[in-house]
């Protein structure tokens, strides 16, 4: 039996296979192992994600380890915890999986997953149920961008029946996830109850939905092409979206621009209602307002007549973080990243009698380099164009009770290095 995967997609010599141990990924890995024998220079690895949702999860790890050992494929096992509020179990598990994939990928390596034609049909129907437009109805692409590399689905044109046939011919063994029989999950409901009925009436229903998905993808690609100049005109060098150029646009054109801007931020596809709210409640809010629309773990805000896509974070104005070993990086609270003092810069290092800390507010009048006279911190933020949501999350370096610098923004006159080896105050952000 010849390989059923689309070998034309496999142009990379480094491949990471998402391997759950189920039928689909077992057939995919088996075919890739065979393909590797024809292409000896290929480096093949597998990754199994342990969600901890099933009592059988440890047994599945053992099964995958045994299979990979037999086929001489290095296996990475990633254990994840699901704790993303506001998402269902399915969405949480998927998010955790793909985060694990992104962490595990090596430079130059591509991710290969085992979705097939029946999966594509289910994805299309789920998008239809949500009322999606062409972008959502495009379902899954055979090749897409992911984590700075590519995600490849070489079985997307094959039915589950073809995979079963392959597995039986080669006497493959796979695991059965008991949750796949739980039709309280939308995808399982479609797989177990709806799609079999549709295919009984129309045997080529899955192929037809795949064609519709491909046509939607084609239309979406054409829209991308036609709107590219508009998007470039509206987008600032910082990646924000300027409101004024969109004021004269039709509602449909404006919504399409906002959707494409969000796609460029790797944001989840917003609903039609969310697009209306972004424009009405954020972009068109009164001038003296600080509008904010929460979308999952992120927010859309307006500042200086621009829309900003940022990760939600709790203000830290009351927080004081001691930095006793200031020669080492300091982890900041609330997922803000880390700071460090690097050799070379215009900030004086602390004296031996000065306790170092990071804070997020500073009282009194401040004297910063490049400005005459004293100003309160709020006024400095305004003059320097620092957005409101960064004002109580930007790390402030203190020696004792003296403000020395704001990371990446300013240095105070008390913090200037004079005739000595200076340091720089560097903030490694983890936020958008």
From Swiss-Prot:
Keyword entries, A-Z: ATP-binding, Cytoplasm, Ligase, Nucleotide-binding, tRNA processing
One GO location term (cellular component): cytosol
Intracellular or extracellular location(s): Cytoplasm
Keyword ATP-binding assigned: yes
GO molecular function, one term: tRNA(Ile)-lysidine synthase activity
GO biological process: tRNA modification; tRNA wobble base lysidine biosynthesis
The protein's enzyme class: ligase
Binding site for ATP: 20-25
Pfam family, any one: TilS_C
Top-level division of the source organism's lineage: Bacteria
Ranges that cross the membrane: none
EC number, UniProt record: 6.3.4.19
Catalysed reactions, semicolon-separated: cytidine(34) in tRNA(Ile2) + L-lysine + ATP = lysidine(34) in tRNA(Ile2) + AMP + diphosphate + H(+)
Task performed by this protein: Ligates lysine onto the cytidine present at position 34 of the AUA codon-specific tRNA(Ile) that contains the anticodon CAU, in an ATP-dependent manner. Cytidine is converted to lysidine, thus changing the amino acid specificity of the tRNA from methionine to isoleucine. This enzyme is essential for viability.
Domain notes: The N-terminal region contains the highly conserved SGGXDS motif, predicted to be a P-loop motif involved in ATP binding.
Family stated for the protein in its record: Belongs to the tRNA(Ile)-lysidine synthase family.
Protein name (record): tRNA(Ile)-lysidine synthase
Lineage: Bacteria, Pseudomonadati, Pseudomonadota, Gammaproteobacteria, Enterobacterales
């Amino acid at each position: 039996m010849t390989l059923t995967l689309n070998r034309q997609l496999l142009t990379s010599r480094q491949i990471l296979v998402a391997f759950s141990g189920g039928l689909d990924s077992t057939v995919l890995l088996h075919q890739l192992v065979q393909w590797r024998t024809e292409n000896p220079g290929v480096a093949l690895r597998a990754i199994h994600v342990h969600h901890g949702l099933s009592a059988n999860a440890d047994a599945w790890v053992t099964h995958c380890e045994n299979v990979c050992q037999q086929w001489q494929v290095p296996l990475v096992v990633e254990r994840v915890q699901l704790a993303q509020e506001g998402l269902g179990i399915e969405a949480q598990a998927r998010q955790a999986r793909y985060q694990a994939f992104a962490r595990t990928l090596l430079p130059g390596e591509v991710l290969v997953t085992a979705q097939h034609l029946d999966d594509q049909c289910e994805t299309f129907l789920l998008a239809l149920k949500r009322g999606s437009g062409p972008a959502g109805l495009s379902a899954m692409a055979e090749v897409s961008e992911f984590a700075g590399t590519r995600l490849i689905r070489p079985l997307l044109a094959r039915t589950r029946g073809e995979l079963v046939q392959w597995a039986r011919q080669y006497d493959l063994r796979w695991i059965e996830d008991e949750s796949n029989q739980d039709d309280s999950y939308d995808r399982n409901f479609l797989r177990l109850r709806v799609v079999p009925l549709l295919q009984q009436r129309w045997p080529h229903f899955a192929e037809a939905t795949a064609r519709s998905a491909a046509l939607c993808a084609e239309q979406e690609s054409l829209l991308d092409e036609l709107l590219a100049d508009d998007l470039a005109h509206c987008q600032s060098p910082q990646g924000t979206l300027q409101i004024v150029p969109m004021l004269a646009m039709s509602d449909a054109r404006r919504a399409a621009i906002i959707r494409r801007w969000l796609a460029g931020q790797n944001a989840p596809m917003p609903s039609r209602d969310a697009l209306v709210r972004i424009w009405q409640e954020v972009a068109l809010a009164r001038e003296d307002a600080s509008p904010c629309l929460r979308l999952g773990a992120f927010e859309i805000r307006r500042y200086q007549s621009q829309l900003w896509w940022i990760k939600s974070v709790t203000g830290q104005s009351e927080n004081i973080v001691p930095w006793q070993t200031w020669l080492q990086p300091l982890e900041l609270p609330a997922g803000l990243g880390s700071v460090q003092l690097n050799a070379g810069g215009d900030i004086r290092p602390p004296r031996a009698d000065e306790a170092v800390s990071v804070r997020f507010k500073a009282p009194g009048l401040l004297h910063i380099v490049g400005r005459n006279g004293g100003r309160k911190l709020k006024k400095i933020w305004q003059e320097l164009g620092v957005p409101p949501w960064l004002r109580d999350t930007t790390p402030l370096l203190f020696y004792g009770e003296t403000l020395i610098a704001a990371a990446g923004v300013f240095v105070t006159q008390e913090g200037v290095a004079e005739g000595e080896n200076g340091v720089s105050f560097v903030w490694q952000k983890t936020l958008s």
